[in-house]
Amino acid sequence: MKAKEINELTTAEMLEKEKQFKEELFNLRFQLATGQLENTARLKEVRKNIARIKTALRQQELNK
């Protein structure tokens, strides 16, 4: 998910996306621990998406 796409979301949508990404990260970590994870790069993608969302939320908070 690109930063531009994230900035177009509402605050509620951002929070929902963050929750979804955190759940996905949790599941990916379990798959990694059990040796079932094939695409390890997905871990990095999800972590970066969470960071992008948190950054956008903070920017909105500071702009108010």
UniProtKB/Swiss-Prot annotation:
Q: Which CDD domains match?
A: Ribosomal_L29_HIP (cd00427)
What's a single GO BP term from this record? Answer: translation
The Gene Ontology terms for molecular function here are: structural constituent of ribosome
Q: List the disulfide bonds.
A: none
Q: Which HAMAP family match?
A: Ribosomal_uL29 (MF_00374)
Q: Which PANTHER family does the record associate with it?
A: 60S RIBOSOMAL PROTEIN L35/50S RIBOSOMAL PROTEIN L29, LARGE RIBOSOMAL SUBUNIT PROTEIN UL29C
Q: Which family does the UniProt entry place this protein in?
A: Belongs to the universal ribosomal protein uL29 family.
Family matches, as NCBIfam families: L29
Q: What is this protein called?
A: Large ribosomal subunit protein uL29
